[in-house]
Amino acid sequence: MLATVQRVSGAQVLIEDKIYSEIGSGLLIFVCIEKEDSIKSITAMVTKIINFRMLDGPKGSTAYSLKDTNEDALVISQFTLAAITGKGNKPSFHKSAKPEEAKLLYDEFMSLFETAYCNVKQGKFGAFM
C-alpha cells in the first residue's frame, strides 16, 4: 500500500462540479492499493497515518498526530501512485491492484480509519475527482 500524506488548511473533493466532501485544517491522504496488499498492510498503514506527527504543536513544531488533535482527514483513492515511470514515456500501473480487489481493501481501509478516528471524510472510489 502506498500513501501520500499532506498537511492542508482545507481541502475539498469535487465530482461533476459539485462538492462531494470537504475538510478544514488537517491531513489530505492519497492512498493506492497494490496487488500484494492485505488486511495486515492496510491496518498497518491506518495506524501509521493516525500516529504521524505532522500537525502543528507549540512554536510551529510538528509535534502532534491526528489522534492528538481534533483536525480533519480527507482520504482519496489514487491508483496512479503505483505508476512505474522508469522506462519510456508511458507509465505502467501493473503494481496497482485490479479495481474490484482495490475497492474491497479501500473500503476496509476506510472502515478501520473511521473506527480509529472520527473526523475523516473521503472521495468516491473510481470517480473522476
Tell what function each PLM region has.
Residues 1-92, 104-128:
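N-terminal, polar/charged subdomain of small-to-medium soluble alpha/beta proteins
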